[in-house]
């Protein structure tokens, strides 16, 4: 499976959470079957791309029948994590970190932040949301024992690489990086970079382009 996963286009991997969320919604509504046309209309993704995306993972559906919703849901769950609940750590309890801890993926039953870390004495030991903030000195030992799936990085940019090094040394294989710093990690560690400033600028460019085209 590892070789197969490495050959899956990045664009396909980025669409998987969209498919998963939709399938989960269909399952909650009691719908037991869905076809690519319905998925296409719900997500504004063309049917050919959906069928191609799904083809990377083998036979997920049957011609003339479509896809079994419950089977798709279990499939996507297995691709996200081997466990029922995805445990997440957070490093850097500033304004953004506190907001994420307070939110704590409340609409996603399968994801929860269980550990948080900071260097400031006035933050360490406090409770944000339902999570008690640990000191950075304990990061590696706690991450190793807690067996977290991923860590969210919300430190100042100047502290990002050092924090990332400690996260990697603890055995975590996924980092969601909210800092403006591009961190260096080994090839077997996945990093998803989220720069809110860049995202906003991108939105403004799209808006301006749309205005000009009209």
UniProtKB/Swiss-Prot annotation:
DNA-binding region: 18-57
Gene3D superfamilies: NAD(P)-binding Rossmann-like Domain, Winged helix-like DNA-binding domain superfamily/Winged helix DNA-binding domain
GO molecular function, one term: DNA binding
Cross-referenced InterPro entries: CoA-bd (IPR003781), NAD(P)-bd_dom_sf (IPR036291), Rex_DNA-bd_C_dom (IPR009718), Tscrpt_rep_Rex (IPR022876), WH-like_DNA-bd_sf (IPR036388), WH_DNA-bd_sf (IPR036390)
GO biological process: negative regulation of DNA-templated transcription; response to redox state
Localization (cell): Cytoplasm
Chief location of this protein within or outside the cell: cytoplasm
Key words of the record: Cytoplasm, DNA-binding, NAD, Repressor, Transcription, Transcription regulation
One term under GO cellular component: cytoplasm
Signal peptide as annotated in the record: none
Positions bound to NAD(+): 92-97
Quaternary data: Homodimer.
Role summary: Modulates transcription in response to changes in cellular NADH/NAD(+) redox state.
Family in the record: Belongs to the transcriptional regulatory Rex family.
This protein's name: Redox-sensing transcriptional repressor Rex
């Amino acid at each position: 499976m590892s070789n197969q996963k490495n050959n899956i286009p990045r664009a396909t991997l980025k669409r998987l959470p969209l498919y998963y969320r939709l399938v989960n919604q269909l399952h909650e509504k009691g719908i037991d079957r869905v076809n690519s046309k319905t998925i296409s209309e719900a997500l504004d993704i063309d049917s050919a791309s959906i069928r191609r995306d799904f083809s990377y993972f083998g036979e997920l559906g049957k011609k003339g029948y479509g896809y079994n919703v419950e089977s798709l849901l279990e499939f996507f769950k297995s691709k996200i994590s081997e466990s029922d609940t995805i445990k997440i750590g957070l490093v850097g309890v500033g304004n953004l970190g506190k907001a994420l801890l307070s939110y704590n993926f409340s609409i996603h039953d399968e994801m929860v932040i269980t550990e948080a870390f900071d260097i400031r004495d006035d933050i360490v030991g406090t409770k944000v949301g339902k999570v008690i903030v640990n000191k950075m000195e304990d990061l590696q030992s706690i991450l190793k024992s807690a067996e977290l799936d991923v860590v969210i990085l919300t430190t100042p940019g100047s502290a990002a690489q050092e924090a990332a090094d400690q996260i990697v040394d603890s055995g975590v294989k996924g980092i969601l990086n909210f800092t403006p710093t591009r961190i260096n990690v080994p090839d077997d560690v996945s990093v998803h970079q989220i720069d809110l400033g860049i995202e906003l600028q991108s939105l403004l460019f799209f808006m301006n382009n749309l205005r000009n085209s009209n």
